[in-house]
Amino acid sequence: MEQTKKWGFWLLTAFVVGNMVGSGIFSLPSSLASIASPFGATSAWLLTGAGVLMIALVFGHLSIRKPELTAGPQSYARALFSDPKKGNAAGFTMVWGYWVASWISNVAIITSLAGYLTSFFPILVDKREMFSIGGQEVTLGQLLTFAVCTILLWGTHAILVASINGASKLNFVTTLSKVLGFVFFIVAGLFVFQTSLFGHFYFPVQGENGTSIGIGGQVHNAAISTLWAFVGIESAVILSGRARSQRDVKRATITGLLIALSIYIIVTLITMGVLPHDKLVGSEKPFVDVLYAIVGNAGSVIMALLAILCLFGTMLGWILLGSEVPYQAAKAGDFPAFFAKTNKKGSPVIALIITNVMSQVFIFSVISRTISDAFTFLTTAATLAYLIPYLVSAIYSLKVVIKGETYDQLKGSRVRDGLIAILACAYSVFVIVTGTADLTTFILGIGLFFVGLIVYPFVSNKFQKEKQA
């Protein structure tokens, strides 16, 4: 049976890299250039990479020391509490927040992919009015974009239902292709790279109020932009139930991080060495502008193809991840048992259907202002759902170290893991505080988890069993 096949190191690594390296990378060089010098941007990448490495190491050693916890952060949240009732509630809210966030992120990726398709199909931005809904005019472009997004969502659904293992191999191919695409971009950029465009490797930048921002401020501001490039680092851990070896999970998480970090740093420096600073800061499509300097008008076509390839792989990985969360939750008893139903190919069909139906609702945001407003609202709220699991995992790792679980005696590995857990906790707090600096974002995010507590008694199998006991 196909479902007995386990995923090895390279397939898991492809999910980590593919889910991290998405659409954000194409705008990051210009946004970083506006707030940091080359030295400031590089320092921010290294600082963020070091922080995420601590989280990756936490995920890695937990996957080995606690191999029975195969659902990632939701398992760690449950195991964090000695009281089963509290643990079950914590595990459920973690699942709920991450799952709801996946509906939103899936739609964001799909609409971004449709946006890049306009380079080849300009009719997708056609402004001709077709009809009105509730007094709102719907244009031909909006209608076609809705159709394209729907096809992309359910086409990906069909791929995953047909063969979950086949989808993992397809994801590997798309991830390898996107990495090779960035290697091509880097090599091509080196031919027109000019160190003179750097000016000085470090220089103060001007803030919005005209004040001069030094290296500390540059690194802090740039770190806010760079931290989002690493969301997805948890991919291999969430998929660890399908892994051939828990050591592969650890190796894939760390290797995926190092590959993504290398791409981020090098392409950032390449763009800074090809485009003049003023032009880079004002560029909406810095990658296109770099390739235009190398190959002329064909640059925009090449870049659009790379972006589409990037986003297709990211879409495939995140839709799978979004369905894997409720699937693993059902196997653990947190969600109703029907979420764990699989077909002969091992695909979690019910989890996929329900996840994608919820995503479909928000695809209406491209033609409905009401749903668009709700989509924006939930996007803000979902921010915290991707950040909290990092902190919970780090705290649980620290608990394991302090209690000495799986450590026979006080060895160097226990001290090392404890230090890593402390650093991961500190970085996770920084990420949450920085990533939700807007009080509204924080309140909405907490509200999302609060909703999880409200629905917990009605959805959780474990709660029903506790009630009957």
Curated annotation (Swiss-Prot):
TM region(s), chain numbering: 8-28, 44-64, 90-110, 144-164, 179-199, 213-233, 254-274, 301-321, 347-367, 375-395, 417-437, 439-459
Compartments (UniProt record): Cell membrane
Membrane topology: Multi-pass membrane protein
Top-rank taxon, per record: Bacteria
Chain segments annotated as coiled-coil in the UniProt record: none
Recorded catalytic activity of this chain's protein: L-ornithine(in) + L-arginine(out) = L-ornithine(out) + L-arginine(in)
Keyword rRNA processing in annotation: no
GO biological process assignments: amino acid transport
Pfam families on file: AA_permease_2
GO molecular function terms attached to this record: antiporter activity
Similarity comment: Belongs to the amino acid-polyamine-organocation (APC) superfamily. Basic amino acid/polyamine antiporter (APA) (TC 2.A.3.2) family.
Full protein name: Putative arginine/ornithine antiporter
